[in-house]
Each structure stands twice: as C-alpha cells, then as structure tokens.
From Swiss-Prot:
Gene behind the chain: KAN3
Record function comment: Probable transcription factor that regulates lateral organ polarity. Plays a role in lateral root formation and development.
Protein name as catalogued: Probable transcription factor KAN3
Stored Pfam families: Myb_DNA-binding
GO CC annotation terms, alphabetical: nucleus
Compositional bias annotation for Basic and acidic residues: 17-35
C-alpha cells in the first residue's frame, strides 16, 4: 500500500451548485441593501408625514384661535397683510430706506414665547410667505399698526437760518439811510423795521439795516464826547478872552480918566481956560485910543468903531479969596 501516490490529483472540483449558491448570496445581499435603503426612506417619509401632520394640526389650531378674532377685526387684518407684503417688496434706494420705522422689530418676542416660523406653499406659479405666531401676535401687530398711524416728524429737516446775501453800502445808499433815520427822529428813536420800510430798497433785508444801524449808533455815540469837549474848550477860551479884554479896557479908561483929572486940577489951579485943557487932553488921548482899537481888533479879528467916552465932568469952582 502506497502512502503517497505517485501523481497527485490536481483537478479542481468546481461544481455548478457552488455558483448558484454564490448567486443566491449576492441576490440576498442586494435585497438586504435595497430593503435597508427602502427602510431609511420609509422612516424619513414617516418623519415627514408626522411633521406635516403636526404642522397641519398647529395650523388648524392657530387658524381656529385666530378665526374668532378675525371676525371682529377683518379690516384690520387685511391692512396688516398688505403691510407685510409691502415690507418684503420694499428695497432701499441708494442707501435710503423707503420706510422710516423698522417694522420687523415688532415681530420679535421674548424668549418665553415660542419662536415664530415661516412656511412656503409652492404651486409652480406662486410662492407666498406667511407669519405663523401664537395668539399674542395679534396684540403686537395691533400695536405696530397704531404706532404707524400716528403722525411722525420728518426725518430729513431743511436747513435753518439761511444767510442773507452781502449788501454793499454805497454813498448814495448810506445817504438814503441817514435821511430815513433823521425822518424817524434820530438814531436813538429809529428802529430797523421802520428804516427798512421807509427806505424801500430792493434786495435790502432787515438784517442789513439792523447791522448798519448798530454801526451808525456806535459811531454817533463816540462822536458826542469829542464834540462836547471841543465846545467847552471854545467856551472857556472865549470867556478868558472876554475877561482879558474887559481888564484891558478898564485899565485904559482908568488911566485916561486919572490923567484927565490930574491935568484939569492943575489947569484949574493955574487959572487956564477949560477949553484949551480939553483940546490938550484929546490930543493926548489919541494914542491911547489907537492902542485900544488895535487890541480889540487883535482879540476879535475885526476892527470895531470906538465910541467916545462921556467927557462931561462936574468941576467945582475954586473958592477964591478976596
């Protein structure tokens, strides 16, 4: 008996049955794979169905709750729907929004209330968004509508205080201004409005007249002290000159009268005729009269006519002893 055959059996025993088994296994694997895929899809569809059912229930609940309130405020609800549509249709133009209030701020609620959500209905032609909220939404929307109805101040106000154009005060215009001020009783009584009405000049505003009148008043007030001081100086000088003139005149008349008295007394004592004494006194008086006239002309600037003094003297006759 041989332990090891001389030629080993190298033929593979491959039967058709083995191939069939492999095919069956592969088919089973494919079926399991398909079932697995179908299982995932069925689970997803179940979840979708559940979520859609929940959504439908919530919609029915909210619609039932809102139906009671919409019956009383149907017009108000329609206006709110129009506002919502206009919000989504609005777009800013060059960075400036068309609406002044941020209307979307009124739709946010506190953390305790459930968050609102949107859903879309697509029918191939139209897609619309609607806001689904809790019953508190109607109260907030009502407040928003009431705030929008109130009148609000404009956002962009016009510039205030437009500056008036500059006005050139010519000599003729200033003369016209001074004439109007004088007609109104002087710069202290004149008012800018009355001066403007009296002048009646084109393109002349109240601001122009007011500033010019203020400058005119300051100039007039500064000129007053200088003129008053000049007048007082002139008056003082005239008084001094008059006093000097009076002193000179009194001195001259006193000197001439004393000389005449002395001469008359001497002639009377010697027994000379009075008429000759008067002639001599007149001859001596001539240089004094000339000096008086020259002094008075230098003081006054004119040469006035000198008046002859009163020469009527009462001379007592001497008592001649026999």
């Amino acid at each position: 008996m041989e332990l090891f055959p001389s030629q080993p059996d190298l033929y593979l025993k491959i039967s058709r049955r083995r191939e069939e088994e492999q095919e069956k296994e592969s088919q089973e694997l494919q079926e399991q794979e398909v079932e697995r895929r179908l299982g995932f899809q069925s689970k997803a569809s179940d979840l979708d169905n559940k979520s859609s059912n929940n959504l439908i229930h919530t919609l029915q609940f909210t619609s039932n709750n809102e139906a009671t309130k919409i019956n009383s405020n149907q017009e108000h609800k329609e206006s709110l729907d129009q506002d919502l549509r206009s919000i989504f249709m609005m777009r800013p133009i060059r960075g400036i929004p068309l609406y002044q209030n941020q209307v979307l701020d009124h739709y946010y609620y506190s953390s305790t209330s459930p968050n609102p959500f949107f859903f879309s209905e697509v029918n191939g032609q139209h897609a619309s968004r609607r806001l689904i909220t809790n019953p508190n939404c109607s109260f907030n929307l009502h407040n928003r509508h009431r705030r929008q109805a109130q009148p609000q101040p404009p956002r962009f106000t016009a510039k205030r205080g437009v500056r008036a154009p500059r006005m050139r005060w010519t000599t003729t215009l200033h003369a016209h201004f001074v004439h109007a001020v004088q007609l109104l009783g002087g710069h202290e009584r004149a008012t800018p409005k009355s001066v403007l009405e009296l002048m009646d000049v084109q393109d002349l505003t109240l601001a122009h007249v007011k500033s010019h009148l203020q400058m005119y008043r300051t100039i007039k007030s500064t000129e007053k002290p200088t003129t008053s001081s000049g007048q007082s100086d002139c008056e003082n000088g005239s008084q001094v000159n008059s006093e000097r003139e009076a002193r000179n005149l009194t001195g001259l008349w006193n000197n001439s009268s004393s000389e005449a008295r002395f001469q008359l007394k001497a002639k009377a004592s010697s027994g000379v005729d009075i008429s000759s004494n008067e002639n001599e006194w007149k001859n001596r008086r001539c240089p004094s009269n000339e000096r008086l006239s020259s002094d008075s002309s230098s003081l006054t600037g004119t040469r006035p006519e000198t008046e002859t003094p009163n020469l009527d003297f009462t001379l007592a006759t001497p008592n001649l002893s026999p």
